[in-house]
Amino acid sequence: QYYTYKKENTKHNFHELKGENIVFRYPGQQTPVLNGLNFTFQAGKNYALVGENGCGKTTLIKLLMGFYRPESGTITIDGKNIQEMDFGELQSFYSAIFQDFNHYNYTIKENIILSNLAAEKQDLNMESAVQQAGFGAWQSDFSKGYDTMLGNLWEEGTHLSGGQWQRLSIARMLYRKAGIY
């Protein structure tokens, strides 16, 4: 069973993200990755998921974002079960960067603003996100500034280092201004 996608992507604030007795196992696996996990995250506070490789940190994030569904247990945002939300509504709460962040063959500006095309004052918000992410230090390296094409699909495409792509992904996440990141 998959989430539906009905609504336009609007931003939502939240007060509490809660998981109760979460169990998740990958198909074909006997042992659950997460077994009876409970948590409560309050808005405005910082939390860190810490653990060994393979202990379920990324799995939990993907559960929270609706990419996976728990075998049992509930995840709620302000008391509403996320499985009752359509995918667009659920995604409006989150902004995340995974280990395999995306490299888009667009301009620098397009790479950043695609996370929130409806934002007002795009240039001002984009500049703030770029500076916070530490990507602005390379701005002088790009002949066309934020209009520089990235990637190898374009003849004039500029290639970025892994670290530069990572900072660009962080700028994209910050530009989105989601309540949970």
Per-segment meaning from a language model:
Residues 2-12:
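Pre-NBD coupling/linker segments of ABC/ABC-like ATPases
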